[in-house]
Structures are given as C-alpha cells and as structure tokens.
UniProtKB/Swiss-Prot annotation:
InterPro entries: UreE, UreE_C_dom, UreE_N, UreE_N_sf. Gene3D superfamilies: Urease metallochaperone UreE, N-terminal domain, UreE, C-terminal domain. This is Urease accessory protein UreE. Belongs to the UreE family. It comes from the Bacteria. Residues 137-156 are annotated as: Disordered. The keyword Chaperone applies. Keywords: Chaperone, Cytoplasm, Nickel, Nickel insertion. It comes from Pseudomonas putida (strain GB-1). Pfam families: UreE_C, UreE_N. GO terms for molecular function: nickel cation binding; unfolded protein binding. GO terms for biological process: protein folding; protein-containing complex assembly; urea metabolic process. The keyword Cytoplasm applies. The lineage of its organism: Bacteria, Pseudomonadati, Pseudomonadota, Gammaproteobacteria, Pseudomonadales. It is found in: Cytoplasm.
Length: 165
C-alpha cells in the first residue's frame, strides 16, 4: 500500500503517478485509507488541520509516488447572483449558521441542504441543486495558508466606532 505523508508544492522533476478523487468530507481527513483512481490502495498520514484542495500533490516518504488530488463532484447548492449586496446577505445568513461555503465572484456554493435553499429563495435568490466539486473557504476547516496571526510582538489597539444615528 502507498502511504502518502507529504504535501508537495513544487514537484520538480517528479512525474504524477496517479490521481485520487475525493469529496470534501474525505479531503478534510488527515488519516484515511483510500483507493486511487487506477485501483491501487493508499493511505493518508498527513498533518492535521489542512483541507486538501483539488489539484494538490501528495507524495510518499521517499518521493516514489506523486499523487494529484481531484475534488469529486458532489451534491451542492449553487447560488449565482450579479447583485453583490444580495450575495453578501446570503453569505451572512449562511455564515451565521456556520455553513462551510465556497465563495467566488458572483457565486456561493454549499453542500446541498433543502432548508438552506428555501431560506435563500426567501431572500429572493435562485438556488440550483447540482453536482459539482466543492471547495469551501479555508476558514471552515483550517486557518488560511500564510494567514494573519495574532501571536506576534505587538498589540492591536481597540478603536471605538461612533454609534449609528
């Protein structure tokens, strides 16, 4: 069995030797037994706290196997809207419910849920149930790569904003 232990950002001269197609629930896991798309057995033994993204490369300890992760199409609800204010309202209401959310210009996507679909329709949005890869924002599962940390040597002063009239 191939044991994938490393994320590879620059494969150099290594050639991709296989792919694995995973839904978002599997891409959240750091320990997982899986079957590559060509039928070979493999295991994930990765650091915790990182959502695998479609296109990421994984390797075994000695670099013999380089595997590309593919995001599997899955049941999602997709909202497309040209009105940024309406889209922001939808994102607010979904975020208030802690829904993992994929955000792109003019588009919101989340794992299909008919109750959430109805809520968004009530806001005046059109919601499509479809099969598509789901790539939620990093904040739902992990801190974003190269994100801002507050573990540094200075304070952020509190600023009181004036009350709205």
């Amino acid at each position: 069995m191939i044991v994938l232990t490393r994320r590879i950002s620059d494969p150099g001269t290594l050639a991709v030797s296989g792919t694995v197609t995973l839904d978002v629930d599997s891409r959240i896991k750091s320990r997982l037994r899986l079957t590559l798309d060509d039928g070979r057995e493999a295991g994930l033994m990765l650091e915790r706290g990182h959502l695998l993204r479609g296109g990421e490369l994984l390797a075994d300890a000695d670099g013999t196997h380089l595997i590309r992760v593919l995001a599997a199409p899955e049941a999602v609800s997709t909202v497309r809207c040209a009105d940024p204010h309406l889209l922001a309202r939808a994102a607010y209401h979904l975020g208030n419910r802690h829904v993992p959310l994929q955000i792109e210009p003019g588009l919101l996507r989340f794992q299909h849920d008919h109750v959430l679909d109805d809520m968004l329709r009530g806001l005046g949005l059109t919601v499509e149930a479809e099969q598509a890869p789901f790539e939620p924002e990093a904040g739902a599962y992990q801190s974003a790569p190269h994100g801002h940390s507050h573990a540094h040597g200075h304070d952020h002063p509190f600023v009181r904003l004036p009350a709205h009239s």
